[in-house]
Amino acid sequence: MSNKKIIKIIKLQIPGGKANPAPPIGPALGAAGVNIMGFCKEFNAATQDRPGDLLPVVITVYSDKTFSFVMKQSPVSSLIKKALGLESGSKIPNRNKVGKLTRAQITAIAEQKMKDMDVVLLESAERMVEGTARSMGVDVE
């Protein structure tokens, strides 16, 4: 596919297994001339093992209206909410705390997210996870 000309790159966050032609997917792909249902079927098939997880996806549209997509790991904030069973973070993170992450949970999230982060050491990835947790109003052990 390297000989095809790229005409557009679309970045979206879609729940796993729940892609449909409704906004924001339909308008973004329709404007690029991509077969919307074709993308939805491929994405849902690729993410059927991760239902409900919020997944960043980068869709590359080529000049002949074909496409390819790359899925990334869920955002750190989404992984933290899943680990603690939260709906959302704190509205006032410095005052209201909504949960507490253990060292083991931080390490597990950092290991899962490591390939999408621009870090070499696990320790650096853990610090990034801790920072995200603090900004959400989650205490870190």
Swiss-Prot record:
Which cellular component terms (GO) are annotated to the entry? Answer: cytosolic large ribosomal subunit
The record's InterPro entries line, in alphabetical order, gives: Ribosomal_uL11 (IPR000911), Ribosomal_uL11_bac-typ (IPR006519), Ribosomal_uL11_C (IPR020783), Ribosomal_uL11_C_sf (IPR036769), Ribosomal_uL11_CS (IPR020785), Ribosomal_uL11_N (IPR020784), Ribosomal_uL11_N_sf (IPR036796)
Q: Name one GO biological process term.
A: translation
Question: What are the entry keywords?
Answer: Methylation, Ribonucleoprotein, Ribosomal protein, RNA-binding, rRNA-binding
Q: Name one GO molecular function term.
A: structural constituent of ribosome
Organism's domain of life? Bacteria
- List, alphabetically, the Pfam families matched: Ribosomal_L11, Ribosomal_L11_N
Keyword Nucleotide-binding attributed: no
PTM summary from the entry reads: One or more lysine residues are methylated.
* Self-association state and partner proteins as the record states: Part of the ribosomal stalk of the 50S ribosomal subunit. Interacts with L10 and the large rRNA to form the base of the stalk. L10 forms an elongated spine to which L12 dimers bind in a sequential fashion forming a multimeric L10(L12)X complex.
**Record-stated family:** Belongs to the universal ribosomal protein uL11 family.
Q: What does this protein do?
A: Forms part of the ribosomal stalk which helps the ribosome interact with GTP-bound translation factors.
Identify this protein by name: Large ribosomal subunit protein uL11
Annotated gene: rplK
